C-alpha cells in the first residue's frame, strides 16, 4: 500500500515538472478550467440553467409509490465466515488519515469529528456495532423495514453501509487496520433507493424472511468474533437476477432505473428534509442519475437542483459521487469539453455540490470515473475495505459476489465520495466557524492540484484531497481564520549527513543532461499509463 502512495506522489510531482519546464503538455487534451466552461448556445450542457426555487418539492416523508421486495437482502458468504481482515486500506495510508485524525483530536479534546452529523442518502445503513451508537434514523423512502428496524436502518443492497463505514466507522479491535475518516462523527441514514425493491404492480410477492437462492450462506448470524470477507448478493425466492450485484456493474447505483426504487423526486425531498432539520452539517450522496446530454433539463433534475440549493443555503456541505461509466453512462471523452456527452445529477449542480472522482492505488484516475466540468476533487475509489453490510455481521468486507461464485473487489466513485464527506466532517469539527462554502473551498484549495490551466481538470477536478493540508493550512481567502499549529510530526526523512560541497557540485554538473533524459522518460511513462487497458471489474 505504501508503494501506491509513493508512486502517486511521484506522478503529481513529475507532471507538474513537465508542464512547468517544457510548457507543451497542457494543451494535449487537458480540459478547460472550470471558469471557461459555458453552456452551449443551443442548450445546457457543461453548465446547468439557473436555479428555479419554485421547483423545490414539499417533503412527503414517504416513498413516492408502493414498493415491494423482489430480491433477498445481502448476506455473508460461506467463504468469509472465519476470515479476518486486519489490513489497513491503501486509501488510509495514501491520505495520511491517522495524522489528520490526530490533528483534530489535539484541537478538539480527543475527538475526531465528534458532534458533527453526516447524512448518508443511499440504500440504508445496517446497524453495525462499529458505529458504536453513532447511527441515527433519518427516514425511509423505499419501504418499511422487514425486521422492525427504525426507518433507514435496513440495507438490503449492501451499499449504504459500506459508504457510511468509510465516513465514520470506529472498530473496537486494535488489530483492525480499517477506520473511518471521521470516526467520532454521527451518521444519519436515509434510505432513498434500492435495487432489491420494485414498484408493487410490477413485482412478485416478496420472498419469505430467510429464503434465498444462489451461493451465500444460509446463516445471517455469524459465530461471535468471525469477520466477513464477502458481502455477496442473494436473489431471494421471488426475484430473478443477481440480487445486489447489479449495483456494482454497468454504472453503479442509478436513480430512475426501471423496476427499482429510487427517484430524483424523493432525493430532492430528502434534501429538503435535511435542510429543515438544522442539525446536519454534511451530506453524502453516493447515488446518481446519468443520462445523455441533450441540452435540456428534466423536471426531476430541476427539483434536485432547487433542493440542493436550498440545503446549501442552510450551511450544509453537500458531497456527491461523480458517477461511474456504464452502458447508459458514457464517458465524457469528446473533444469539446463544453458539450459533454453525459450529464450526471447531482454532480451537474457544481455551484452547490462538491462532486468526487475516483483514483486507483497508483494515483491514476480510475477508468470508471466519469469526467466532467463538475468534478470538484478526487479520492481513493478502488480496492475498498469497509463494514460488512450483512445484518448481524460484526466485521469487514473487501469483496462482493458477482454472478454466483464470481467475487469482485469493491470499487466505484460511490466510495471515493465518503472519503471527502468524512474530511468535511473533520474540517467542520476543527473549524466550527467556517461556513459550508468555506469548507468546500478549503478542501479544494488544499488538494494536490493537477498540472492543468487553473489548477484543475475534468478528471480529478482540483486534485486528490489532502486531509492534513486541509486541517492545517492558512488560506488567504479565510479572513480572520487562523490554522492552528499541527504540532510536532514524526520525521519522515533520515537525518542529514555532514556538509560536503562535492555532492552539490556533482549534482549541478549533471543537471542539464539528466533533466532532459528524465523528462523524456517520464513523458513516455505517462503516455503508456494514460493508454493502459481499462480493468473489467464492476463498480458500485
What do these predicted regions represent?
Residues 1-40, 508-527:
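Secretory targeting and sorting signals
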Residues 43-45, 49-262, 276-278, 392:
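Active-site core segment of subtilase-fold serine proteases
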Residues 105, 168-172, 192-195, 272-279, ...:
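Sec-exported extracytoplasmic/periplasmic mature domains
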Residues 113-117, 183-188, 276-283, 313-318, ...:
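Loop/turn elements at helix/coil->beta-strand transitions in domains of secreted/extracellular proteins
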Residues 123-127, 141-142, 172-173, 193-197, ...:
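Solvent-exposed loop/turn segments at secondary-structure junctions
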Residues 197-345, 406-411, 415:
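Substrate-binding/access-modulating region of protease and related hydrolase catalytic domains
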Residues 344-426:
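Extracellular S/T/G-rich loop segment that most often corresponds to the catalytic His/Ser-adjacent loop
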Residues 431-540:
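C-terminal subdomain of the subtilisin-like protease fold in secreted/lumenal serine endopeptidases
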Amino acid at each position: 500500500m505504501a508503494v501506491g502512495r509513493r508512486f502517486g506522489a511521484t506522478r503529481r510531482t513529475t507532471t507538474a515538472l513537465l508542464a512547468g519546464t517544457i510548457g507543451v503538455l497542457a494543451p494535449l487534451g487537458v480540459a478547460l478550467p472550470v471558469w471557461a466552461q459555458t453552456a452551449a448556445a443551443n442548450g445546457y450542457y457543461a453548465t446547468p440553467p439557473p436555479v428555479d426555487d419554485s421547483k423545490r418539492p414539499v417533503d412527503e416523508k414517504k416513498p413516492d409509490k408502493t414498493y415491494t421486495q423482489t430480491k433477498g437482502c445481502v448476506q455473508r458468504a460461506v467463504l468469509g465466515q472465519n476470515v479476518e481482515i486486519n489490513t489497513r486500506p491503501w486509501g488510509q495510508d495514501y491520505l495520511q488519515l491517522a495524522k489528520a485524525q490526530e490533528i483534530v483530536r489535539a484541537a478538539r479534546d480527543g475527538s475526531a469529528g465528534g458532534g458533527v452529523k453526516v447524512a448518508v442518502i443511499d440504500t440504508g445503513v445496517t446497524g453495525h456495532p462499529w458505529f458504536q451508537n453513532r447511527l441515527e434514523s433519518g427516514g425511509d423512502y423505499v419501504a418499511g423495514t422487514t425486521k422492525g428496524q427504525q426507518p433507514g436502518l435496513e440495507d438490503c443492497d449492501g451499499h449504504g453501509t459500506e459508504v457510511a463505514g468509510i465516513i465514520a466507522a470506529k472498530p473496537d479491535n486494535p488489530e483492525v487496520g480499517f477506520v473511518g475518516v471521521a470516526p467520532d462523527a454521527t451518521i444519519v441514514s436515509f434510505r432513498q433507493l434500492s435495487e432489491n425493491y420494485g414498484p408493487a404492480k410490477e413485482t412478485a410477492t416478496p420472498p419469505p424472511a430467510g429464503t434465498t437462492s444462489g451461493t451465500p450462506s444460509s446463516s445471517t448470524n455469524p459465530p461471535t468474533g468471525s469477520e466477513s470477507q464477502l458481502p455477496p448478493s442473494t436473489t431471494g425466492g421471488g426475484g430473478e437476477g443477481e440480487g445486489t450485484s447489479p449495483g456494482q456493474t454497468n454504472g453503479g447505483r442509478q436513480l430512475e432505473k426501471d423496476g427499482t426504487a429510487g427517484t430524483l423526486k424523493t432525493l430532492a425531498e430528502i434534501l429538503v428534509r435535511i435542510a429543515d432539520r438544522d442539525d446536519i452539517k454534511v451530506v453524502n450522496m453516493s447515488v446518481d442519475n446519468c443520462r445523455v446530454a441533450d441540452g435540456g433539463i428534466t423536471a426531476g433534475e430541476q427539483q434536485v437542483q432547487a433542493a440542493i440549493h436550498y440545503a446549501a443555503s442552510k450551511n450544509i456541505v453537500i458531497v456527491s459521487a461523480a458517477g461511474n461509466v456504464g452502458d447508459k453512462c458514457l464517458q465524457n471523452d469528446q473533444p469539446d469539453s463544453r458539450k459533454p456527452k453525459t450529464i450526471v445529477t447531482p454532480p451537474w449542480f457544481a455551484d452547490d455540490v462538491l462532486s468526487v472522482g475516483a483514483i486507483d492505488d497508483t494515483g491514476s484516475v480510475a477508468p470508471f470515473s466519469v469526467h466532467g466540468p463538475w468534478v470538484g476533487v478526487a479520492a481513493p475509489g478502488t480496492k475498498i475495505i469497509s463494514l460488512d453490510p450483512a445484518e448481524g455481521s460484526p466485521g469487514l468486507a473487501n469483496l462482493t459476489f458477482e454472478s454466483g461464485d464470481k467475487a469482485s473487489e469493491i470499487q466505484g466513485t460511490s466510495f471515493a465520495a465518503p472519503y471527502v464527506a468524512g474530511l468535511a466532517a473533520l474540517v467542520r469539527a476543527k473549524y466550527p466557524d467556517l461556513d459550508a462554502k468555506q469548507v468546500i473551498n478549503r478542501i479544494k484549495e488544499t488538494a494536490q492540484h493537477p498540472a492543468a490551466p487553473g489548477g484543475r481538470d475534468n478528471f480529478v477536478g482540483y486534485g486528490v484531497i489532502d486531509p492534513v493540508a486541509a486541517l492545517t493550512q492558512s488560506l488567504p481567502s479565510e479572513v480572520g481564520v487562523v490554522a492552528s499549529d499541527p504540532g510536532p510530526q514524526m520525521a519522515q526523512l533520515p537525518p542529514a549527513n555532514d556538509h560536503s560541497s562535492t555532492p552539490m557540485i556533482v549534482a549541478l554538473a549533471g543537471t542539464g543532461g539528466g533533466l532532459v533524459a528524465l523528462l523524456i522518460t517520464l513523458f513516455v511513462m505517462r503516455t503508456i499509463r494514460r493508454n493502459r487497458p481499462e480493468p473489467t471489474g464492476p463498480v458500485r
